[in-house]
Amino acid sequence: MAPLNFDLSSVPDRKSWCAQLVGRQTSRKIISTSEQFRFCSSIIYDEEYLSSRKISIVQYLLHFLMDISIFFLLLCLLQTLSLSSSNTLDNLRGTSLSVEKPSDKLVSENGEFSAGFFPVGDNAFCFAIWLNKSSTPTVIWMANRDEPVNGRGSVLSILADGQLILTNSLGITIWTTKAADLTSLEPEVTNLQLQLQNTGNLVLHNSKDVVIWQSFDSPSDTLLPQQALTMMSSLISRKGQDDYSSGNYKLFFDNDNVLHLLFQGPTMSSLYWPDPWLEDPGQAGRSMYNTSRRALLHDSGYFESSDHFQFNATDFGVVTHRRLTLDPDGNLRLYSLQKMNVSWDWVVTWQAFSDPCRIHGICGPNSLCSYDPVSGRRCSCLQGFKLKDQTDWSYGCEPEFSIPCNHTDESSFVLLAHAEFYGSDIFFYQNVTFQFCQEQCLNRCDCNGFQYNYNEGSGYYNCYPRYLLMSNEWTPITKFCWRFLFKTTKSRYFS
């Protein structure tokens, strides 16, 4: 078949005709008009040359436009690669981050925070946010801390209804945010974007910057500056320095509008901050009358709460980074990132407890807690008891003997002169004798000991039979008005 030939003599301006033709292929206007003219000038030249080569103008143009199409295809591929490596993912519907790709992570614009799959064990990962600047990465938030996923097939995705969803290799949902109501938004503004901000906040928002979800609303064990703790949120400690699963301690606003620390142990739970022996939180400077229940850490290191609790960091002022963390030992600490020689490390600039033995559950039931500023905290079992779990002191100690339930001569008591055990009172008897208190405990199968104390205010001796011996504090300072006796058998010998 003879090649098709266009008679260009009928076109008054060949360059304009060619520019229009190429312009249709370059609607994205990546190629300027002058460049279009140069392209056309390069192909509309000596017709005798084309005729001698038996090449029609149409064939030449088709070959030229094919080259242009390949160019645009390569350009689109480059743009896609650039998008996948940026710190934001645009139009995330159907887009995901994979645990199998270490490069699949979000990075804040300042480069100091990252969000992605963080290793928490052998073939175990959690979707997390961490700070890169410290000598070792510091995790500040986790989505699935209690249910890690394996290293194959797990992905974080954004669904069309505005949910973030984490699925494992079997497609089972491990973690998800609450579905957002996007029905009120116009279709053209429902394009979603997941962005890690310079504050460490991971935000899912639409094209009008309406926040659909943010990590600041659901903290793990850490608060960052400008991140509010509210009646809808809490801090939950991790189990250990290298165990990111939920631990035994919680910071939250209780129904009395006061910010509390709570111990949630295997066998019991108890409030331990503010001091539980205070009859009124007002004695600790707290107010129960502000119902807003909101606390905030400022960049300067100033912390304020709606219950009037407040403090300043020892290095008050602007520093590189701060974090308020409920640590695995139940102590609430404020840290600042400081340069130590060549590395950046965290330094404690405030803590709720200087004596860790005042923290409930730190040593578990049937144990004693002692603290020395030099050697630190030490847990030990009561004599005749043994550690229940060699890896976790929160389970406490268990007796190596059995106590008869009925009132017999086989039961006896051992005096602990400087120890105090908190909570778990069976009864409270005021202005009674020591013998009466002892008889009450002997007559009850669930009584494992009793506290017999002198109250200076009333001038009475009070009796507290207890069913659980949760250690609070042991001190070498003799407090003659403190006496605790725990039940044992006469056949046991205690030094």
What are these regions (language model features)?
Residues 1-15, 21-76:
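Classical eukaryotic N-terminal signal peptides for Sec-dependent ER targeting/secretion
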